Amino acid sequence: GVGAFYSNNHLVYRGMPAFQMRMNASGTPGAPAVADTMPVVRVNLATRVLDTVGFVKIPKTNIGLSNSDGKFNVTIEVNPLPVIDEWSVTSEGHIAIVRGKDYHVDWMLADGTRKSTAKIPFDWKRMTDDDKAALIDSVKAVRDRMEAANPGQNNQLSQAYSAVMGGGSPPPNMMMMMGGGGGGGGAPRGMPQVSAVVTYVSPSDLSDFQPAFFATAARADADGNVWMRTINTKPTAGGPVYDVINASGEVVDRVQIPLERTIAGFGAGGVVFLSHMEGTVTRLERARTK
């Protein structure tokens, strides 16, 4: 989800996950701990009153850190198919948090009251052990192709961590305060040597069911609905399919957009604006759901 204004003079935004940098007994940096949730908050811009709407589950990243002869080895373990939550703010000012575990919606209404609506029917796909292993193998193959196309990718990641641990600028979305930093444009003196590698969780750590949606799946239209871009559980021709969910938590429509189109925005009365790339030109198209 993204931050949004609405008519009651409130600003809704997503906070940052808790991040704790640990130190070993020897005084060297240890593996940081990153929370797997982050808050969604609502602030009244007139009264400055802030409410925590709830917490959304985000992808869990496990970071390992070891030190050998002055060289730090960083391992970043990620889950390529995480079960997460999504959120959006409707045109009526209601905040919807869509839960990935069972696909239901927790609401904070515009007047501040809260409610939860029923689970949304979904054709859940069970992931067999073979499915999980094939997915991890496929993701690794994609990573290998990307690394071959950009040989300096891992080196750039390692340099970013070297800067952090030597007192320079941190990588995006990482905040740490450590001694030894200095100003100026060059790398800090005494910057440690860091090797950073991205790995993936074991297939057995993947969910037994394919998630209903990925991150950034939620969009609010101009008619009070939340559009959820779902993950297909069966081969489907055409573009992505969206569940259109009303304020009662009911799917009132399922909309498939054409291939190579992306939703750019909405208009009242079921109007959808789609963007389409044609070479170097981006075209905006107007369509109706009905």
What are these regions (language model features)?
Residues G1-K290:
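Eukaryotic scaffold repeat domains enriched in small/polar residues
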